[in-house]
Each structure stands twice: as structure tokens, then as C-alpha cells.
């Protein structure tokens, strides 16, 4: 429905939101079961079900991104609404986003260092985070986990500039101003992640899986 031109624009956006919410629920409820069956049994049908689900989800995610990027965002721009999505934040917004960062966001950010050797990992379930790769003045690298407080703050912020209304993700505002959270360090990488935890998964396994995805190992 979100990809149909005949559907009103606002309704198409709502359909994308519903899909995203349903996918979260599927990952919390169904995927752990499929993963467990794939791991614990030798039944080829169970293995096929898990892999089929992964392929279908990847296909749907690709289509989600295509519809949003190629259909929804251009239509919004025609109405002078610029939704910042997978692009650099315009520098002209930095002053306004900075006010929001210091007045609303900074106080509820709680960076936590990830101790890879000790497998210390305190991420909460079903929460958004930014994994920040830092390098100190001696060139030593470390990883910090920064919460994206969408449970207490709006997920989107609106700004006016040059006759356009900009729609900006909360996480993009945080990313733009991370230098104030880590003033003595060089930021070499920022990755958005969402933790959807299977109760049976050990935390050290979860940490290993996340780091492998980030570093491509």
C-alpha cells in the first residue's frame, strides 16, 4: 500500500510505520523460535523456514528503503518538507539542532564503555543505541555505547530553514553533536543499532554478534 501512488501520502507513511512496528514484533516473538529450531534440530524444514524468513525480511527491507527514498521523500519535498534520511545533516541546521541537543538531549544521554575483553554489555532490550568508535590522544581505540532516548524524547524534530521544513531523526541530532559528548577524542565511526534481545541469548554472544556486523568480520 505504501508504494501505491493512488494512496494519500500521509496514509503511505502510516503504512511504512505499521510495517516497521510489525517487523519489530516479529523479531521479538518469531525469529528467536526459528533461530532456536535451526540451531537445536537437524530438521531441514526448520532450517529452511529460518533462512526463508531472513531472505524475505531482507527483500522487504530493501523495498521499504526504495519506497521511502524514491517515492515518499520526493513527494514530501514537493510540499517543501525535507526529511533527512541517509544523508548528511545540512550545516545550516547545526545551530538549531545544537540548541535542541544542549537544552533537551544531552542531559538524558548515558554513554557506556563497551569492554570487549570482559564482555561487559549493558544494553537494554528493544532500545536504540549508537555505537561510537573513538580514538584518544594517544591513538588508543575504544568503543562507547550511547543511548538514543526515544522513550523520553520525540523520535523526530522539525526545523525551518530557507523556506523548507526539515524533519530530522533524534539519532541524527545526537550524531551531529557527539563531539561535545567526547571532546577529547577523535570520532572514527558511528553506527545505529537496535537491541532486540532473545531471552535465551547470552550477553557475550550478543556483543560478539553486534561487533562482527559493525566491523564486517
Q: How should these model regions be labeled?
A:
Residues 1-217:
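N-terminal non-catalytic structural scaffold regions of very large proteins
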Amino acid at each position: 500500500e505504501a508504494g501505491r501512488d493512488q494512496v494519500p501520502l500521509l496514509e503511505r507513511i502510516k503504512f511504512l510505520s505499521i510495517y516497521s512496528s510489525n517487523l519489530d514484533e516479529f523479531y521479538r516473538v518469531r525469529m528467536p523460535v526459528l533461530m532456536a529450531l535451526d540451531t537445536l534440530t537437524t530438521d531441514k524444514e526448520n532450517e529452511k523456514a529460518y533462512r526463508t524468513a531472513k531472505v524475505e525480511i531482507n527483500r522487504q527491507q530493501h523495498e521499504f528503503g526504495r519506497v521511502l527514498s524514491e517515492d515518499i521523500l520526493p513527494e514530501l519535498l514537493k510540499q517543501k518538507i525535507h526529511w533527512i534520511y541517509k544523508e548528511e545533516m545540512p550545516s545550516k541546521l547545526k545551530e538549531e539542532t545544537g540548541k535542541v541537543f544542549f537544552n533537551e538531549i544531552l542531559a538524558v544521554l548515558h554513554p557506556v564503555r563497551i569492554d570487549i575483553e570482559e564482555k561487559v554489555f549493558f544494553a537494554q532490550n528493544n532500545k536504540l543505541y549508537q555505537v561510537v568508535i573513538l580514538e584518544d590522544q594517544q591513538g588508543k581505540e575504544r568503543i562507547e555505547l550511547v543511548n538514543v532516548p526515544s522513550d523520553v524524547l520525540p523520535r523526530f524534530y522539525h526545523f525551518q530553514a530557507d523556506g523548507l521544513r526539515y524533519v530530522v531523526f533524534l539519532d541524527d541530532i545526537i550524531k551531529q553533536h557527539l563531539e561535545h559528548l567526547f571532546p577529547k577524542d577523535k570520532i572514527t565511526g558511528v553506527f545505529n543499532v537496535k537491541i532486540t534481545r532473545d531471552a535465551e541469548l547470552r550477553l557475550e554472544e550478543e556483543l560478539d554478534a553486534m561487533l562482527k556486523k559493525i566491523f564486517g568480520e
